[in-house]
């Protein structure tokens, strides 16, 4: 019997969870026309190359159709969120209201251990940064800063037309 250490066990679970969510995301997209996806999501569809293109976290992301693979190569969960977004976007304009995927009527990404782990990691990452350091990181990701009651409020243009459920 092979003993699996905690890291590899978590990696296997992580990859299995990703794979289990990637399949339905791609399947949903295959039932939609690329022109319709582009219209509802704010992406641009280049028919001659069969590529959808959109801006996410200050980078231009290209998604091949009908394979629905992203380039440049993105972290798996970023790719998954973009694919679900393309399937769910309904053309709703960006607002300043915070909406989570788990809060959406048909959201495929629900509150989970992953959400909790990411929140914990982000909190740990940011706690070691100065306000100027955080501002530089936000700016590198394409954030726009806005006035609020918070010490720092940044708006990230992660997905252009988020579905409002």
What do the PLM-derived regions correspond to, one by one?
Residues 24, 34, 66, 72, ...:
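Proline-rich intrinsically disordered, low-complexity coils
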Residues 36-62, 146-164:
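Amphipathic, interaction-prone secondary-structure segments
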Residues 1-2, 164-165:
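Acidic, proline/glycine-rich low-complexity IDRs
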Residues 55-116:
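Aromatic- and glycine-enriched beta-alpha-beta binding-site module
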Residues 2-49, 93-147:
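Short Lys/Arg-enriched alpha/beta "domain-start" segment
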């Amino acid at each position: 019997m092979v003993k699996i250490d905690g890291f590899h066990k978590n990696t296997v679970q992580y990859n299995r969870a990703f794979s289990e969510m990637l399949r339905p995301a791609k399947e949903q997209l295959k039932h939609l026309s690329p022109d319709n996806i582009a219209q509802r999501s704010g992406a641009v569809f280049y028919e001659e190359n069969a590529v959808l293109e959109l801006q996410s976290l200050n980078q231009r992301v290209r998604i091949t159709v009908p394979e629905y693979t992203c380039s440049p190569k993105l972290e798996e969960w970023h790719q998954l969120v973009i694919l679900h977004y393309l399937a769910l976007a309904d053309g709703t304009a960006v607002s300043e209201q915070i909406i989570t995927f788990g809060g959406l009527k048909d959201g495929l990404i629900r509150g989970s251990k992953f959400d909790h782990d990411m929140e914990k990691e982000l909190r740990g990452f940011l706690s070691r940064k100065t306000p100027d350091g955080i501002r530089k990181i936000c700016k590198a990701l394409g954030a726009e800063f806005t006035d609020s009651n918070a010490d720092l409020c940044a708006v990230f243009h992660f997905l252009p037309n988020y579905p409002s459920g």
